[in-house]
Structure formats: C-alpha cells, structure tokens
Amino acid sequence: MDSNTVSSFQVDCFLWHVRKQFADQELGDAPVRDRLRRDQKSLRGRGSTLGLDIETATRAGKQIVERILEEESDEALKMTIASVPASRYLTDMTLEEMSRDWFMLMPKQKRAGSLCIRMDQAIMDKNIILKANFSVIFDRLETLILLRAFTEEGAIVGEISPLPSLPGHTDEDVKNAIGVLIGGLEWNDNTVRVSETLQRFAWRSSNEGGRPPLPPKQKRKMARTIESEV
C-alpha cells in the first residue's frame, strides 16, 4: 500500500475530528454539519477499502499535523493561505431535504465513475426539478455533495451522490451523471428542469425551460444507455 495514501487518510481522519469538535461546540453552520455527515461516510468507505481503523488513523494524523505546524512559521502560513483559492458552498436544498429518507417503487441504480445514480422508474408524467448542494471554485462546480430530483409535490424521485469508497470527481463527471438521470426520468414522459444555481455553475448556460444544453452526442449516448437498461 502506498505510504502517501495511508498518510492522506490519517490526516483526513484527524481533520474531520477537529471539524466535529468545532461543530459540537455549536460554532459550525449548516454547510459544516452537512459536510461532516458526508465526509464521515467517505472516511468509513476509505477505511474499509484500505483496511485501516479510523480511531488509530486519527491519532496518527494528529501527529503528522502537529509535526507540520511545529515546522511552519507564521509568515509561511500566511503566504500559503493567500495562495490557495477559496471555494464556495452553494445550497439548493435545505438540511431537511438533504437528510430525508426516500423510497422507490421501481428502483434503478447505475454507477457513473465515482458517482451513484438512483431513480424511481415508476414515476411518470411529472414535472421534476433537480436541486443540488455543491462547492464552487473559479465559478465552476468543484465537488458535488448531493443532488436530488423533486416532483412539484416535494417527493424525492432520484438522486446522484458520491460513492464513499471512490472519492474524487470532476464537473464533467457530474454533468454526465445528470445527463443519465435526466434521460432516465424523461424516458417515462416526465418533464425535467435543473435549478438555476446548478445550471449556472455546471454549464454556465441553459435554455428557457431550465434544461441544460446537452450536446447531440451526449443525448444519443443517454438514449442508448437508458434503452439498454430498461
């Protein structure tokens, strides 16, 4: 096993522990608590994949961070912070919408890279909107936290979420996954639109109906994908 992979996991475990202590003192806002929950699932998946105990890794991560801080001067720390671009956290969904359990009458699940796509194929002739919580850097989608498809009545009928055991994805991965989800929902004559926030940072453009401008090649690929799986 690569030593950098292990040390990265150890540091991530310790930093999660620090953020958890911060939130437990009621100093964190909703995005902080949301990320804690999502990152906890990711760490559990990584720990299982690597065969490492999270508590032991957290202690080792603390030692690594303490050693770095001892060697780092205040001036170097200021320069590092100034040189790192800051990401923003954007929310279409409330905490309740993100944490709500939902059920599928005709479940369909597909993996697209490190993203898991789930949808209820029993849903027909509905108006559906896609909402997402994600981070943005340089005015582009950086990391998807969670995307869900809602009917006008507020029912959840689809979802895209990162796989805890496969961290890391690009904005193109997210757009491709959204294309698959839209294709699956539209197959049953549902009308799907994407939230303005998601359109702006994932595609930087959209049509008036809230439908992202998918290229013809991707449309054909989506149709073939859904047709082969139904």
From Swiss-Prot:
Entry-linked Gene3D superfamilies: Influenza virus non-structural protein, effector domain (3.30.420.330), S15/NS1, RNA-binding (1.10.287.10)
InterPro entries the record matches: NS1, NS1A, NS1A_effect_dom-like_sf, uS15_NS1_RNA-bd_sf
UniProt short sequence motif Nuclear export signal, positions renumbered to this chain: 137-146
Places the protein is found: Host nucleus; Host cytoplasm
GO BP terms: symbiont-mediated suppression of host cytoplasmic pattern recognition receptor signaling pathway via inhibition of RIG-I activity; symbiont-mediated suppression of host gene expression; symbiont-mediated suppression of host mRNA processing; symbiont-mediated suppression of host PKR/eIFalpha signaling; symbiont-mediated suppression of host type I interferon-mediated signaling pathway
Keywords: Eukaryotic host gene expression shutoff by virus, Host cytoplasm, Host gene expression shutoff by virus, Host mRNA suppression by virus, Host nucleus, Host-virus interaction, Inhibition of host innate immune response by virus, Inhibition of host interferon signaling pathway by virus, Inhibition of host PKR by virus, Inhibition of host pre-mRNA processing by virus, Inhibition of host RIG-I by virus, Inhibition of host RLR pathway by virus, Interferon antiviral system evasion, RNA-binding, Ubl conjugation, Viral immunoevasion
Function, as annotated: Inhibits post-transcriptional processing of cellular pre-mRNA, by binding and inhibiting two cellular proteins that are required for the 3'-end processing of cellular pre-mRNAs: the 30 kDa cleavage and polyadenylation specificity factor/CPSF4 and the poly(A)-binding protein 2/PABPN1. In turn, unprocessed 3' end pre-mRNAs accumulate in the host nucleus and are no longer exported to the cytoplasm. Cellular protein synthesis is thereby shut off very early after virus infection.
The protein's assembly and partners: Homodimer. Interacts with host TRIM25 (via coiled coil); this interaction specifically inhibits TRIM25 multimerization and TRIM25-mediated RIGI CARD ubiquitination. Interacts with human EIF2AK2/PKR, CPSF4, IVNS1ABP and PABPN1.
Domain topic, free-text comment: The dsRNA-binding region is required for suppression of RNA silencing.
Recorded family membership: Belongs to the influenza A viruses NS1 family.
Name by which UniProt lists this protein: Non-structural protein 1
